[in-house]
């Protein structure tokens, strides 16, 4: 009985530690965890997208406000100040993600359909995640990290972690492990 109690307490402590421990951006820059830094787009007020959503028409989408634009610039400055370099910068095709990635300004931004939001069924969840998993699987295990600017649902589906706007999770596709990275805007 005593051992089962200790095991239960140990498991609970491990769960709490796993969900609360985050590495600082400086720690991540000095020793990146995995090859991928997943970033949720910066603040875009509202919930979901309007019913008239069209992929290439930002006027039909929820977009960054000025606070979100400033948040994006601050994230980019924090990346540069930490000396963080990215091998590639990839973004969802949604306007709020593309604008976040461009305002961060740490490299040429490439659209990646595997980063698109399947929250409202605009794209199919399984096909989108299959595309992203293929991209992650094809990443060489060594090299500078890649930055993926995407949505809450995508980050959660891959890492099991929820994130707020402008928050980051480091992900290792080889071990399928993830760790939060604290940004100055958190």
Where are these regions (language model features)?
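Active-site-proximal alpha-helix that buttresses catalytic centers in soluble enzyme cores
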Residues: 23-113, 118-121, 161-186
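A short, acidic, amphipathic alpha-helical segment used as a generic capping/interface helix at domain edges
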Residues: 130-140
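Short, surface-exposed amphipathic charged segments that create phosphate/polyanion-binding patches used
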Residues: 123-131
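Bacterial N-terminal signal peptides that target proteins for export
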Residues: 1-7
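N-terminal signal peptide c-region/cleavage motif recognized by signal peptidases
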Residues: 17-19
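Bacterial N-terminal signal peptides
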Residues: 7-15
């Amino acid at each position: 009985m005593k051992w089962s109690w200790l095991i239960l307490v140990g498991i609970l402590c491990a769960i709490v530690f796993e969900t609360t421990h985050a590495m600082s951006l400086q720690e991540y820059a000095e020793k990146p965890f995995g090859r991928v830094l997943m970033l949720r787009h910066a603040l875009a007020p509202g919930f979901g997208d309007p019913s008239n959503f069209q992929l290439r028409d930002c006027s039909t989408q929820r977009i960054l406000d000025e606070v979100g634009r400033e948040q994006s610039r601050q994230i980019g400055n924090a990346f540069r100040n930490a000396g963080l370099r990215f091998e590639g910068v990839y973004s969802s095709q949604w306007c709020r993600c593309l604008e976040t990635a461009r305002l961060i300004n740490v490299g040429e931004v490439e659209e990646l359909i595997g980063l698109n939001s399947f929250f409202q069924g605009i794209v199919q969840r399984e096909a989108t995640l299959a595309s992203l998993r293929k991209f992650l699987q094809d990443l060489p295990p060594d090299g500078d990290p890649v930055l993926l600017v995407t949505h809450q649902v995508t980050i959660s589906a891959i890492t099991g972690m929820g994130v707020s706007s402008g928050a980051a999770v480091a992900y290792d596709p080889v071990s399928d492990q993830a760790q939060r990275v604290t940004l100055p805007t958190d």
